[in-house]
Amino acid sequence: MASGSYWCYSCSRFVWVSDSISCPDCDGGFLELIQEPLDFTPSDSFTTTTTTQHRSPTRFPPPSSSSSTPSASMHADNSPTPTIVTRTRSNRSPNPVIVLRGSAAAPSSDVVSEGLDRSAFQMYYDDGTDSGLRPLPPSMTEFLLGSGFDRLLDQISQIELNTNRNLRSCEHPPASKSAIEALPLIEIDPTHLLSDSQSHCAVCKENFVLKSSAREMPCNHIYHPDCILPWLAIRNSCPVCRHELPAEDLTDGTGAALTAVTATAEEEEDSAAGLTIWRLPGGGFAVGRIPGGWRGGDRMMPVVYTEVDGGRLGDERLPRRVAWGSRRGGRDGGGSRERGGGFAGRIMRLFGCFSGSSGSIAAAAAASSGSGSRIRVTRRTRSFSMFSTASSSSRRRNWLA
């Protein structure tokens, strides 16, 4: 093996490796074999300077290309010494990685590992040259899927599956409009204020004001009108005792029932579009959600801003946007990108789990082919991040989107 023939993306320099193919300095496996390595002997000063100034990964294209290969300058004794490449926005390693759902085609045996269908995901990166999103090379995709990404994506899929089950188990439809309008509007009197159960609104927990207005449920529980009406718009039960009002008539006029969870084709395109996954400097991953509203014919997709990407949380700058490159998919590891309904329909079934239980995302649930039913649900959109590796417990944190 030629000395110094491997480039470490973590240390941003050429290194000698053992048979285990790992960097002897950072013990990382993010290495690339350079076919024509520079023949030099690194000095102690070079090692120290490089290690301290280039801890952050280097972005594609790899160092073997002319744009990012560390050039050699000649000393008086004609011995080549490396020229340190300044870390810029255009030469960092692919971070974040854009993850989209892959093709629904049956996977081949060589893309399935440890129970995860690797063809179920498409991975892209922005090379920082305004050329748009590019599919990750096959070798890099295989590396990421073998370094914790597979467990991370598998865990995300399990969360999505559990969330969909919870949506399907929701048995409380909205209250009917006539039942809501029939709720009496009463005036708060001293007897209400003396009662433990009627002195305050059970939704906002605030005490009623004498001679103010309140809505009274058939179960005699009373609420502020501004509190109970939004509640009854999403479920027909009393927040305290679960007494149920008549439910909304979920029919479309032709006898075909509408389930409590559906979306039209336009709402599907407004749902979650995908994920942005960052590798954190201290290890592990951070996951951000690409906001909805993306259309199949659009050339642009929004990308979340974080400290890892050079911005500060709370910064007033607009989120950075990246465009799809002219090269799409193929055999470069990302799969083909279709325009129009095919690709849009595929990405609309992406990670609907990235929202809290109190929240509202236009869930992209496919309509049942035989029943003619349509599903409709809204929950508040919220981003979600995983700071530990997929094998550790995840923690929540909002990312700017």
Swiss-Prot record:
| Keywords assigned | Metal-binding, Transferase, Ubl conjugation pathway, Zinc, Zinc-finger
Bias kind Polar residues: ranges: 76-93
Tell me which PROSITE patterns the record gives: ZF_RING_2 (PS50089)
Known EC number: 2.3.2.27
Zn finger region (RING-type): 201-242
Q: Which InterPro entries match?
A: DUF1117 (IPR010543), RNF126-like_zinc-ribbon (IPR039525), Znf_RING (IPR001841), Znf_RING/FYVE/PHD (IPR013083)
Please tell me which top-level EC class this enzyme sits in. Answer: transferase
For biological process, the GO terms are: protein ubiquitination
A Gene Ontology molecular function term for this protein is: zinc ion binding
The region called Disordered is annotated at 41-93
The metabolic or biological pathway listed in the UniProt record of this protein is: Protein modification; protein ubiquitination
Kindly state which reaction or reactions the protein catalyses: S-ubiquitinyl-[E2 ubiquitin-conjugating enzyme]-L-cysteine + [acceptor protein]-L-lysine = [E2 ubiquitin-conjugating enzyme]-L-cysteine + N(6)-ubiquitinyl-[acceptor protein]-L-lysine
Lineage top rank: taxon: Eukaryota
Q: What does this protein do?
A: Probable E3 ubiquitin-protein ligase that may possess E3 ubiquitin ligase activity in vitro.
Q: Which PANTHER family match?
A: E3 UBIQUITIN-PROTEIN LIGASE PRAJA (PTHR15710), E3 UBIQUITIN-PROTEIN LIGASE RHC2A-RELATED (PTHR15710:SF93)
Could you identify this protein by its name? Probable E3 ubiquitin-protein ligase RHC2A
Name the species this protein comes from. Arabidopsis thaliana
